Amino acid sequence: MTFHFHIPLAFRDLLKSGGIGQYVVQEVLPVRHVDAQFAAFQTSFRTEAPLCILQHFDTLYSILHHFRSLDIAIKEDVLEVMVKVASRHANELPAILEDLNLSVPQRAAHLNALKMNCFILTQLIEAFEAETYKASLGSVEPSGKGKKAKSKPEGFSWESERESILQALTHLLQLDIRRLWSMSVVEEEFVSMMTSCCYKMMENPNIVMAKNKSTREALGHLLGVTVKRYNHMLSASVKVIQLLQHFEHLASVLVHTVSLWATEYGMKPVIGEIMREIGQKCSQDLSRESSGFKAFATFLTELAERIPAIMMPSISVLLDYLDGENYMMRNSVLTVMGEMVVRVLSGDQLEEAEKSSRDQFLDTLQEHLHDVNTYVRSCVIQIYNRIVQEKALPLSRFQSVVTLVVGRLFDKSVNVCKNAIQLLASFLANNPFTCKLSSVDLKVPLEKETKKLKEMREKYQGPKPVVVISPEEEWEAMLPEVLEAFKILQQESKEEEDIETEEIESSQHLREQILILLRKTSYKNSIRLTQKGIERFQEDPLFSEGDSEAKSELGILEKIFTEKKADLEQPTTKDQDDAQVNPTSEELPSQEVQNSDMDKQEMLVQYLSDAHHFALKIEEAIDVISKMMYETAVSVVQEVIEFFVTVSQFGVSQALLGVRRMLPLVWSKEPGVREAVLSAYRRLYLSSNGESERVKAQALVRSLSLLMVDSSAGILQCLEEIVSEFVQKGDIHPSVIQLLWEKFTQKSPCSEFERRAAVMLLGMMTRGQPEIVMSNLDTLVSVGLGEQVQKDYQLAREVCNCILKITDSQKQTLGKSTEPFRLPKDHSLFVCLTEAVAGGIGLSGLHWLPFKETAVRLVYELGEEPEEICSEILLRCSQNVLDGHQTQDEVPNVPAFLLTHLLSLAGDVALQQVVHLERAVSAELRRRRVLKEEQEAEKVGKQRKSKANESTMEEELGLVGASADDIEAELIRKICDTELLGGQQYLSAFLPLILRICNNPGRYSDPDLCTVATLALAKYMMISSDFCDTHLRLLFTLLEKSPLPSVRSNIMIALGDLSIRFPNLIEPWTPNLYARLRDPSREVRKTAGMVMTHLILKDMVKVKGQVSEMAVLLIESDQEISALARNFFNELSNKGNAVYNLLPDIISRLSDPDCGVEEEAFRTIMKQLLSYITKDKQTESLVEKMCHRFRTARTERQWRDLAHCLSLLPFSEKGLRKMQDCFDCYGDKLSDEAVYNSFLTTVAKMRRGAKPELKALIDEFEQKLSRCHNKGLENMDVPEEPSAESDAQPPKAKRPPLASVNVKKGKSEDDFQTPKPPASRKSRRKVAVNFSSDEESDLEAELSEAETPKNPTPIRRTARSRAK
């Protein structure tokens, strides 16, 4: 063998002549000779085995050269044979490699054969891969008419062959083939050839498909062998990075491959190399490839899920990305940290270094909870969610993380809020404290155990140990001061008084005196005494020592201080030792037991303290989350609902708040929200397991009753919808209904509230199953409305409501031709109701009024001839009121509360009579007419055969039906106008009294009586348009002048109903309705806001510029009113261009110096209103209108307001051009600093995200603004002489704040008159209606047609108008 096979860089390089002894392809066979030569190769393979390729390589090369032109059968045969050659070679090589007598030519032959075989196989792999990929691209193209889809060759599938080829190559590489090379070093080109085909296969997007899983496995193993045995690690690391940058689909594939290298092949360093390569990539490099960041982020994230422990040593190389601009890389690195915390750094057995790493990771995560990017904040919360669910978060961090997450509930991002709610729910579900988290319940044991811990400390530890300082240490501290005193003494004259020493009897006494002086820091005197001792007690060894005078005295002082002090301390120490040896009779536990008890108690207190603080934070979160219940984002609402289900299961004290707020969502138009509410209540109240039906029923009734405590009518209606839904679907067991009847009939002991709750629940269930009440109607009447009714009118009212549910269910089920369900007028129900209402009119309790209202409605809903029943009730009540109150002059003197009851009853009857006529009587007339027409049609029996005739008949019948409807409606209207309030009717008997009280509010001063009389008048006005027109001025006068907020609120509500019934009569008074929006009473403003919202959204009131009064409510300090105003504009914004059309007038009114609002308030209002302008055309139009408005602006305040409004609009290129076109309108106003700054804000907003060509236009506009601003400032520097006219002009009055406007009380009745029209309006003089308290005659305040206003009264927000 005289040649060696050199692996070429390119396929065609083998045709070129290389170095000496290098193999070169001699001839590329033509296609027609390929079959014959390939057959010869097969024959040679049977005899020469793998070495046959040495003679037939040119044939195989030719096949590859003509690969696209060859038939599929040849390709398949070549592939099959080459796989056999490689497998055969792999089987023979182990023995050859072990042969010590292998000659050099034989080794060279096997090496050449190995390289040739592998070269041909890798080239075949790449050729088949390219052909398959091209075919897959072609199969995606749509086939036109007449085109046949390309049929795949039968019997051959490249996808199924790939795995066997890769396994054959892997088998070869697993052998010790290094021995074939000289120096046992495999050439790099061979390794590159083997791996490049693998990377080529990975580039195919189809590699990620599930069917190619085995191929991915084979690729991973082949590359793993090269990384481990052939020094391919660094090259593989670089190649992985390149593949990730260019092929986004490979992230998951490479994660599997790389983790395989690290785990099964033990090549952990490759992970560090890849992470280092990623860490060294700069943002500029990655920005060129849009998919680069995403692929790297996905790769790191999924790799951390597989091998976080192996990645952990190299995490530092990625930390720079946390400060980078790309949020995906930040998310990826943070996710990697989270996985390491969960799977590597969790548990109690961590070392200090591991704890430190965990804390650093958690600190980093906490910092990025406030990341500037929404997606990062959301990702961090999700990471924490996983950490909490895996119980990997240290207890010491619970408080800080929960606090941060509660803060994220206020995030502007919907995803962040949603994930924050999920995390708080996970905190609850995985909390290590207790299953019942109530701060109130936890506070008591915490205080108890804290007190116990304090007592234990006092008992076991005793007084705090005193720090013991040795005499030598004390002397060292004193020495500088002693030396200073010695120097001072040497300088002083000896004329100072000598210390008397007569009393010193001995040297021992002298020592004690010196020690006392030293303790008192009297160093000079102690030195003098020492000098005296040296002179006097020479026989004492202490005073006779020392070389020099100074050293002698200092030495004596030191010895006296240290020795004497030590002697004095010894007895104390001895006493303490004796005390330890001889303890008191009360034996204390050993020190170990004491320490153990103390540790246990401290841990208990810490546990309770953490639990208490955690419960407080959760309750704080509940308050915030409950306000998110009505967000527009469905996903957030669903998470809130799920959160409150979790909270309720853990017994948090405020959970009921959220569960109640959840109820109105059952009316949501979003099916997902409604279903979430129903599912939540089903889980909360119907999912008890492992208990008897009786126990479940008791628990359900108890829970629902608790939910009804202090609930409003709206909440109860929502609960009724849910309960009826459960009943219809059979979710409520009959044992629950049985228990409710037992509670109502007092067979089961219960409180009064529980009894009422049982009746309410029975009524709710009746909507879903009417038989519940229908079959027990007699029981309801006898128990709830029987002899004991006067003891509990609340229960009686709920019984009436329960029976009314029959009618509600009947309305839903009965058809138009079915006779309505009604009871005879002598039924026991109406007998009991008559007795209950008449018997309670004389009682002064508060519960009779609502009972009476419900009873009257029940009579009209269920009774036949209800007007006769109610006339009997009114007669009985009138007699009861008059009985016992007659005087000698036969003029009754009736208490105010009796009149209140009587007039309230009369008003309810009047209103229900109208409702009865409009609904029940009208529907019955229509039903009878339709039934009669059907019967007549059956008698005639004529059938139309042609479709034309049938349609003609239907049209005729339709016209007849419409005409008949009009006739019936006219009949009902005539009855209301002429008969109901006629002189002989029972309702008219109460009218004089009602009008007298309303006309004389000074004489009838009882607030309740005035309120009820006004309401009764309004209800009477609902009957007849003539009566309404006659007394409308009286009603509006009371609305404006009455000092009672309850009267004004009730009138406002009544006028809302009157606007719907008689819109033409109320329309001229519309300004008076708007005026109540600035009423001094909070309740009246709230009521007016609700009424006007209803009327405007129902198109019952024309929306004019006066709607600015509603806009003012946006800045109300009362949260309910401001929320009502926000809701109004939210709904109005959904009605086409309503808000857009009103904005110019609203801006004009609110910025008016005479009747506008303060500047800050104006900005707050406009920020809300301009947020509804989202369409470009609307913005452009508003920009133009506001720019032109600058010309007519009178004050600088108006300039600022207009400029601020412009800064709030969302600008486009067209909007900018509009501003430039209108520059002359506002250019001269730019000298005002505030105006100029607002325009700069507008420019800055437009610059964000603008295209390059638009930025040039913005820069030009900004320069123009700057020039005008500077020019205006220069002109302002020139002083101007003030004109006389401007000096003489008085300041204009400004609108006082709402709080300063009060209704004057205590005035005479002359003040109660209809306000005069403005002076500028010329009209005929109108009669002013005066009310005098001295009047005795009945005034009906009837006005002529001329006195009724025909045009709206303009509203002026000036103090002057209020003073009139």
From Swiss-Prot:
GO terms for molecular function: histone binding. It comes from the Eukaryota. InterPro entries: ARM-like, ARM-type_fold, CND1/NCAPD3, Cnd1_C, Condensin_cplx_su1, Condensin_cplx_su1_N. Phosphorylated by CDK1. Its phosphorylation, as well as that of XCAP-H and XCAP-G subunits, activates the condensin complex and is required for chromosome condensation. Residues 1333-1345 have a biased composition (Acidic residues). Keywords: Cell cycle, Cell division, Chromosome, Cytoplasm, DNA condensation, Mitosis, Nucleus, Phosphoprotein, Repeat. Residues 579-596 have a biased composition (Polar residues). It is found in: Nucleus; Cytoplasm; Chromosome. A motif (Bipartite nuclear localization signal) lies at residues 1317-1326. The modification Phosphothreonine is found at residues 1314, 1348, 1353. Residues 567-596, 1273-1364 are annotated as: Disordered. Residues 567-577 have a biased composition (Basic and acidic residues). One of its GO terms (biological process) is meiotic chromosome condensation. Residues 1-588 are annotated as: Interaction with XCAP-E and XCAP-C. Gene3D superfamilies: Leucine-rich Repeat Variant (1.25.10.10). One of its GO terms (cellular component) is condensin complex. The C-terminal domain interacts with histones H1 and H3, and may be responsible for condensin complex targeting to mitotic chromosomes. This domain is independent from the bipartite nuclear localization signal, although they are contained within the same region. Regulatory subunit of the condensin complex, a complex required for conversion of interphase chromatin into mitotic-like condense chromosomes. The condensin complex probably introduces positive supercoils into relaxed DNA in the presence of type I topoisomerases and converts nicked DNA into positive knotted forms in the presence of type II topoisomerases. May target the condensin complex to DNA via its C-terminal domain. Component of the condensin complex, which contains the XCAP-E/SMC2 and XCAP-C/SMC4 heterodimer, and three non SMC subunits that probably regulate the complex: XCAP-H/NCAPH, XCAP-D2/NCAPD2 and XCAP-G/NCAPG. This is Condensin complex subunit 1.
